[in-house]
Amino acid sequence: MTRLPILLLLISLVYATPFPQTSKKIGDDATLSCNRNNTNDYVVMSAWYKEPNSIILLAAKSDVLYFDNYTKDKISYDSPYDDLVTTITIKSLTARDAGTYVCAFFMTSPTNDTDKVDYEEYSTELIVNTDSESTIDIILSGSTHSPETSSEKPDYIDNSNCSSVFEIATPEPITDNVEDHTDTVTYTSDSINTVSATSGESTTDETPEPITDKEEDHTVTDTVSYTTVSTSSGIVTTKSTTDDADLYDTYNDNDTVPSTTVGSSTTSISNYKTKDFVEIFGITALIILSAVAIFCITYYICNKRSRKYKTENKV
């Protein structure tokens, strides 16, 4: 009974034995070889293929046949015919060359009159090391601790530490002179908006004038804006005037006051496009062709009658 566990242990060790491995770097040449156990039989053919289903070559006598886009420039077969060892050399290794390579022997007995062929195969694993593996190992072996983030709002900002201060855009200060009682507010903005559409283009130019408000003069400057819209039917120009006093109130008060339009005028100008001229030209050409056709038909009928009349008079 003790022999059975020993036998099972030996079988498990045999099947657990990994394939022979060959480790190379990218760009190097790798030589793979395997020996056959049956040295008495006659080798009919040897083969190399890469798992799972890629045939590299078949060798019979001095003939070597390559498959699956493999060539002798990439893989050279260095084994003499009917040798105990079969060898291939893979040149200029790439990452795609890594994998399990299998060599196979097809043998027959010289004294056997039957066509029985024995088969032996052996596997070798090729490992291609890339330069990126060491870099990945260094990155993975480093610290994976990420800095903690807080969503709490700080109570104050220390201006002495420049690295922790954010640049905040603030409006220009308003100058208030107590003696003169003069408030000066200056607005400067240029806005050009262009809108492109299938029917045409729209362009808006707005340039508000500076506003100066004094207690003594209380001068208010109106803002005039022109809007030009070009469409397929024509060009529409709109002129609007806005009282800047509302803008002054909006700046000084917390409540927002909408802008007021004092007056507006609209002018429409018709415009002809190339399509209209094409239609007119087509209609004119059609009329001319119709007139020519009518003339030709009339001429043909009259000429035919004239010939018929002359023929009858001759008879």
Curated annotation (Swiss-Prot):
UniProt keyword terms in alphabetical order: Disulfide bond, Early protein, Glycoprotein, Hemagglutinin, Host membrane, Immunoglobulin domain, Late protein, Membrane, Signal, Transmembrane, Transmembrane helix, Viral envelope protein, Virion
All ranges on the Virion surface side of the membrane: 17-279
Principal subcellular localization: virion
Pfam families: V-set (PF07686)
Annotated Gene Ontology cellular component terms: host cell membrane; membrane; viral envelope; virion membrane
Stretches for region Disordered: 194-213
Disulfide feature: 34-103
Subunit structure: Heterodimerizes with OPG040. The heterodimer OPG185-OPG040 interacts with components of the entry fusion complex OPG143 and OPG094. Heterodimer with C3/VPC protein; disulfide-linked.
Function: Prevents cell to cell fusion by interacting with and directing the viral OPG040 protein on the host plasma membrane. The OPG185-OPG040 complex associates with components of the entry fusion complex (EFC) presumably to avoid superinfection and syncytium formation. Via its interaction with C3/VCP protein, protects the infected cell and probably also the extracellular enveloped virus from complement attack.
Family that this chain belongs to: Belongs to the orthopoxvirus OPG185 family.
Name of the protein described by the UniProt record: Protein OPG185
Organism (species): Vaccinia virus (strain Copenhagen) (VACV)
Species lineage: Viruses, Varidnaviria, Bamfordvirae, Nucleocytoviricota, Pokkesviricetes
